[in-house]
Amino acid sequence: MIKGIAEYLDININTDLYLTMYNMVKKHDNNTFGKTPFVSYSLEDNRTGKPTGYEKAFWPVLNEHKRVHPHYQFRSTGFNTANSTEKDVFAHTDIDLDTEHPNGYNIVVPVLGNSRIDYFETRDEEVYLPEKNAHGHAYYHEFYAQKEMGQGTPEFEKFLSDRKIGHIIVDKPILIQTTIMHRVVVTEAPRCAWVTRWNNIPKDVSFQEFKQKVENIL
């Protein structure tokens, strides 16, 4: 756990409900999770920017999460899955440049398997915006070093190790801040987790204030 960045939530979770929703959608078309080897079942197709039609299936959870905050990012909200511990989500940020307010926080609910989220010191001069989404907006940062050294190389892993500031084990629901570079490491597969990315949150709403709201409502 990293205070103010990635913390456990004291909330009740109906795992059977999440499994039921996952089994409903995994029979249908999946979505690539950006450039990563993860497979996702989210509210928006990452490649086209069009709705996937899963909102009805996900409504039991979305309806509760909208009580916390009415805005969520369609592209990132849904299930993220990996069938191997060799697959991870590379170090990145998640940002929203197309909303009125800048803040965004993710709830991550483990459903199957296990994973760890590593966090890294984030220096402006070491990151860049590599691409735009289907709507024409930059949506994440990447390390220059990843492009220069290559993802997964010993040199880049050493770079990450030198900048690691902490981690959190995703074995129960967590709330995370995503403007700091972080990556997801699968430690037990198959891995499936639910993510709701609440966005368009006013900048004066702190991590702790939002966490308290999540725990009060959920």
Language-model-detected regions and their locations in the chain:
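Catalytic core of Fe(II)/2-oxoglutarate
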Residues: 142-218
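Secondary-structure boundary elements
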Residues: 67-71, 112-116, 201
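A structural signal for short, well-ordered beta-strand segments and their strand-loop junctions
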Residues: 73-78, 106-110, 118-121, 175-177, ...
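Catalytic core of non-heme Fe(II) oxygenases with the double-stranded beta-helix
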Residues: 80-169
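Intrinsic-disorder/low-complexity, polar/charged segments enriched in Ser/Thr/Lys/Arg/Asp/Glu/Gln
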Residues: 4-8, 104-106, 163, 193
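Non-heme Fe(II)/2-oxoglutarate
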Residues: 1-80, 88
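Short beta-strand-to-loop capping motifs
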Residues: 10-13, 111, 196-200
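Extended hydrophobic/Leu-rich segments
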Residues: 5, 18-21, 58, 62, ...
